Regions:
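Hydrophobic transmembrane helix bundles of membrane-integrated enzymes that assemble
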Residues: 1-28, 33-137
Length: 137
């Protein structure tokens, strides 16, 4: 039941990620515009914004509409969460799980667009995943 609940929430969040760029005001995408447009050609390896601009330029995600970016990025993030593990009581409705469900919705808003947080989330998830093995911990 936990896995079914997780998959259901992931599907809902990805659908919200597809819809939000058409519904939310422009201020929600204030960080995404400079990353995608790169008006001053700041791409590079040093600094968070230049690295993010380089990442989205190399992958081509910066040229796609935000809803398509959400369709690509969100399943990657939720797959990383799946690899880390789903809690045993994830399907139970309680305050802690409701906060987790709401945080998943916030992820669909703020990471379903070109952002530095997408890259940060990937690195953090990889570190957590590696430390779950006794070989690395």
């Amino acid at each position: 039941m936990n896995k079914i609940q997780f998959i259901l929430i992931v599907i809902i969040c990805v659908l919200f990620g597809l819809i939000f760029p058409f519904v939310l005001p422009e201020r929600f995408y204030a960080d995404a515009r400079p990353i995608v447009l790169d008006l001053y050609n700041e791409k590079g390896l040093i600094g968070s914004y230049p690295f993010t601009m380089l990442f989205y330029w190399i992958t081509g995600l910066g040229k796609l509409p935000f809803s398509i970016v959400a369709l690509i990025q969100l399943p990657i993030l939720f797959f990383l969460l799946w690899l880390i593990g789903i809690p045993n009581r994830f399907a139970q409705i309680n305050i802690k799980n409701c906060l987790i469900y709401l945080s998943f919705l916030m992820v669909s808003v703020f990471i379903g667009q070109p952002s530095k947080e997408f890259i940060t989330f990937i690195f953090a998830a990889i570190i957590v995943y590696l430390f779950q093995y006794k070989y690395f911990s």
